Amino acid sequence: MKFIDQTIIQVIAGNGGNGCVNFRREKYIPKGGPDGGDGGDGGNVWLQSDNNLNTLIDLRFKKTFQAPHGENGSGKNCSGKKGSDIKIYVPVGTKIINYQTREIIGDLIKHKQKILIAKGGWHGLGNTRFKSSINRTPRQRTLGSVGEKRDIQLELILIADVGTLGMPNAGKSTLVKSISGAKTKIANYPFTTLNPVLGSVNTEGKKFIIADIPGIMQNASQGFGLGVRFLKHLERCKILLHIVDLCPTDHSNPVENIRIILNELKKYNTSLYNKPRWLILNKIDLIKSSEIKKIIDKIKNFLKVEERFYLISSIKKIGVKKLCSDIAFYLQK
């Protein structure tokens, strides 16, 4: 199924039903009093999260959702039927934004969490409501009010404990697949991963969710490549794993690749840049130990600060168990 993480829909709540003007007319009761009933309230529109959904694709094709109107009141003090509510189901992690005002209406981060996004109109009052000691035959009534109408932007942000980032073909997908069994495509060319993928990792009785997003390239913040569009899916993560290829097939400089990623991350969002970030130096099986030491020295000199880093080989699972164990321990703190 195609991964869609953003869409705009229109929601229209039902109008309230009108109140009724009516008088009791029965045999032997020629001057019966008012008996006009109230209208019914308009139907509401709700959004509800569902763990079984992982894309907004269904809402890309149906753009307008309208709840039924409340029915008008009638004689014999009969109230109109309330318009039934409607629910729109979305994936867990969906952020709800008022498209016009940019106000954040809500954020559905739990299963079966729901939020009212368009309130139905209030019912109109029948003439019975206006009877008094000085007005025995009221002809007043009120009309039902109009239901709310809104344009809503829905933005899906995946919920994961750990997120991966790095250049295309750095080995992010291989790592995620090797530790979680996630069904992510792997090949020896850039941008193999076209959409975010979630994997569940179990280690030493502890469990965490890891997200794999498409690789980031230079000038991604200006629209190049794929990754910057999906960086938002790292916003809920507690740790970021910055995967670095120590032996790039394009012969690029690993230190320069680190600089590119950090620069693009900072330009995208400073709060994301400031998240806890571990440096994962990958593909150590393809390079000599002496070369690894030289690269590490250059990285430390570039970063200027002490940053936690790991030496691993995703494909041969060297150092991976220790990494997973440390992640699980960190998340429990």
Curated annotation (Swiss-Prot):
Cofactor(s) recorded for this entry are:
Mg(2+)
Query: What are the binding positions for Mg(2+) in this chain?
Result: S173, T193
Q: A GO molecular function for this record?
A: GTPase activity
Q: Which residues form a coiled coil?
A: none
Q: Where is the Obg domain?
A: 1-159
EC annotation?
A: 3.6.5.-
Which domain of life, per UniProt? Bacteria
User: What keywords appear on the UniProt entry?
Assistant: Cytoplasm, GTP-binding, Hydrolase, Magnesium, Metal-binding, Nucleotide-binding
State the protein's purpose.
Answer: An essential GTPase which binds GTP, GDP and possibly (p)ppGpp with moderate affinity, with high nucleotide exchange rates and a fairly low GTP hydrolysis rate. Plays a role in control of the cell cycle, stress response, ribosome biogenesis and in those bacteria that undergo differentiation, in morphogenesis control.
Recorded family membership: Belongs to the TRAFAC class OBG-HflX-like GTPase superfamily. OBG GTPase family.
Domain OBG-type G positions: 160-332
Q: Which gene is the coding source of this polypeptide chain?
A: obg
Q: Which Gene3D superfamilies match?
A: GTP1/OBG domain, P-loop containing nucleotide triphosphate hydrolases
Enumerate the InterPro entries for this protein. G_OBG, GTP-bd, GTP-bd_Obg/CgtA, GTP1-OBG_CS, GTP1_OBG_dom, GTP1_OBG_dom_sf, OBG_GTPase, P-loop_NTPase
Stored HAMAP family: GTPase_Obg
Output one GO BP term: ribosome biogenesis
Q: Which PROSITE patterns match?
A: G_OBG, GTP1_OBG, OBG
The protein's name is: GTPase Obg
Location in the cell: Cytoplasm
Entry binding sites for GTP: 166-173, 191-195, 212-215, 282-285, 313-315
NCBIfam families, A to Z: Obg_CgtA, PRK12297.1, PRK12299.1, small_GTP
Q: Which GO terms describe its cellular component?
A: cytoplasm
Q: How does it assemble?
A: Monomer.
| SUPFAM superfamilies to which the protein is assigned, alphabetical | Obg GTP-binding protein N-terminal domain, P-loop containing nucleoside triphosphate hydrolases
